[in-house]
Amino acid sequence: MARKQQTRKRRVKKNIESGIAHIRSTFNNTIVTITDMQGNAVSWSSAGALGFRGSRKSTPFAAQMAAETAAKTSLEHGLKTLEVTVKGPGAGREAAIRALQAAGLEVTAIKDVTPVPHNGCRPPKRRRV
């Protein structure tokens, strides 16, 4: 019996001039999501999605590669200017911002939106190595 050929949905190129780059940098990973001004995702990438595993995932180089990958796909959608919001204490914060600038995107503003508790949850105990 003949198989029914699946029709693949093509990615529609959105013509977006400006957007927001959300950089979520934790101690274990860095996730870069580029959205339009309303918050609809245009492209995303992370260190883990690029094949970095274990301790290599939390390096600035992995964050740089994740930002470059997200920037390349957003440039295809016509993105030119970015506002950057950075969240978290990770090692890849500055590396990701520099990679976005190097990819040809103009960074207009950088905001730190790291959530700071008003003495909420107890933090995890200190590591003894």
UniProtKB/Swiss-Prot annotation:
Located on the platform of the 30S subunit, it bridges several disparate RNA helices of the 16S rRNA. Forms part of the Shine-Dalgarno cleft in the 70S ribosome. One of its GO terms (biological process) is translation. Disulfide bonds: none annotated. The keyword rRNA-binding applies. Gene3D superfamilies: Ribosomal protein S11. InterPro entries: Ribosomal_uS11, Ribosomal_uS11_bac-type, Ribosomal_uS11_CS, Ribosomal_uS11_sf. This is Small ribosomal subunit protein uS11. Part of the 30S ribosomal subunit. Interacts with proteins S7 and S18. Binds to IF-3. The gene is rpsK. GO terms for cellular component: ribonucleoprotein complex; ribosome. Keywords: Ribonucleoprotein, Ribosomal protein, RNA-binding, rRNA-binding. GO terms for molecular function: rRNA binding; structural constituent of ribosome. The keyword RNA-binding applies. Belongs to the universal ribosomal protein uS11 family.
